[in-house]
């Protein structure tokens, strides 16, 4: 419970947040578009040093929502990439929800015309009247993130889903695919991006295993050999030896027998037995 409280505290107010940013996003100044440059500089700091501050980044997206003329596509992509590797927290979806009014392409309500017939028209066709077929518009099945169809944002959304669902091998193979080269170009400019994704995998393993094979965790982390050993041994409490990785004990992976003991007083037992008797015996 203490660790969960500490994690929530870091989410609301990370220790890396400067005092002037704390004051800015805690008051009405967060809605002042003149503060965008300050928030942009703070985001650049996060990209450089690997820190992360969701609430400050959400403040940027909120200002874009109120001031579409200030919208900066590159800033949005960087914010989404930082939120992506915060899984399993819902940060990515929170960011997407604030892009609803952004100047980006969206799924059209009616995107494609198809020739279809109504039930009445079908009945007419059976009687030989085929000239009244009505052409109606049907929604097109378009890949989207929320309702946004910007190709890069859709790809980020797909990566976010893979991380959230703990499909780590698929995450790495998708990220390495040719169609995701633009994602890799942006991610390469973010300090510790891949290691942040690896920590998502470690947290998932930490809650489910007491030990795991080296081969399996290598696939989860997209590392092998000395790089894998170096990364694992750098984690507090983790050890790699003889092809097996030992996971540190924590409340989620400890196996404990649960003993439930209920004490019933003699008085309570007397009342229970009295209520269980048939009316005939009570008389």
Curated annotation (Swiss-Prot):
Its main location: cytoplasm. Residues 52-263 form the PCI domain. The keyword Protein biosynthesis applies. Component of the eukaryotic translation initiation factor 3 (eIF-3) complex. One of its GO terms (biological process) is regulation of translational initiation. PANTHER family: EUKARYOTIC TRANSLATION INITIATION FACTOR 3 SUBUNIT 11 (PTHR13022), EUKARYOTIC TRANSLATION INITIATION FACTOR 3 SUBUNIT K (PTHR13022:SF0). The lineage of its organism: Eukaryota, Fungi, Dikarya, Basidiomycota, Ustilaginomycotina. Residues 114-135 are annotated as: Disordered. Keywords: Cytoplasm, Initiation factor, Protein biosynthesis. This is Eukaryotic translation initiation factor 3 subunit K. SUPFAM superfamilies: ARM repeat, Winged helix' DNA-binding domain. Component of the eukaryotic translation initiation factor 3 (eIF-3) complex, which is involved in protein synthesis of a specialized repertoire of mRNAs and, together with other initiation factors, stimulates binding of mRNA and methionyl-tRNAi to the 40S ribosome. The eIF-3 complex specifically targets and initiates translation of a subset of mRNAs involved in cell proliferation. Belongs to the eIF-3 subunit K family. HAMAP family: eIF3k. It is found in: Cytoplasm. GO terms for molecular function: ribosome binding; RNA binding; translation initiation factor activity. One of its GO terms (cellular component) is eukaryotic translation initiation factor 3 complex. Gene3D superfamilies: ARM repeat, domain 1, Winged helix-like DNA-binding domain superfamily/Winged helix DNA-binding domain.
């Amino acid at each position: 419970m203490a660790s969960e409280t500490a994690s929530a505290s870091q989410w609301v107010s990370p220790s890396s947040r400067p005092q002037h940013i704390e004051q800015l996003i805690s008051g009405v100044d967060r809605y002042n578009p003149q503060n965008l440059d300050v928030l942009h500089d703070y985001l650049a700091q996060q990209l450089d040093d690997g820190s992360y501050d969701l609430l400050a980044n959400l403040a940027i997206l909120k200002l874009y929502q109120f001031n579409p003329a200030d919208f900066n596509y590159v800033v949005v992509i960087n914010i989404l990439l930082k939120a992506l590797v915060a899984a399993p927290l819902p940060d990515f979806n929170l960011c997407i929800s604030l892009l609803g009014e952004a100047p980006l392409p969206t799924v059209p309500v009616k995107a494609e015309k198809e020739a279809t017939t109504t039930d009445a028209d079908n009945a007419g066709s059976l009687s030989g009247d085929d000239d009244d077929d009505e052409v109606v518009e049907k929604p097109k099945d378009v890949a989207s993130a929320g309702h946004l169809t910007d190709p890069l944002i859709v790809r980020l959304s797909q990566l976010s889903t893979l991380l959230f669902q703990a499909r780590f091998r698929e995450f790495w193979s998708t990220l390495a695919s040719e169609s995701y080269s633009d994602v890799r170009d942006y991610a390469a400019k973010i300090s510790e991006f891949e290691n942040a994704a690896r920590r998502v995998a470690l947290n998932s393993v930490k809650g489910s295993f007491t030990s795991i094979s080296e081969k399996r965790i290598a696939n989860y982390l997209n590392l092998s050999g000395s790089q894998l050993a170096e990364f694992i041994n750098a984690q507090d409490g983790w050890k790699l030896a003889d092809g097996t990785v030992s996971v540190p004990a924590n409340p989620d992976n400890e196996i404990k027998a649960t003993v439930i003991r209920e004490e019933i007083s003699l008085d309570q037992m007397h009342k229970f037995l009295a209520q269980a008797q048939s009316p005939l015996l009570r008389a």
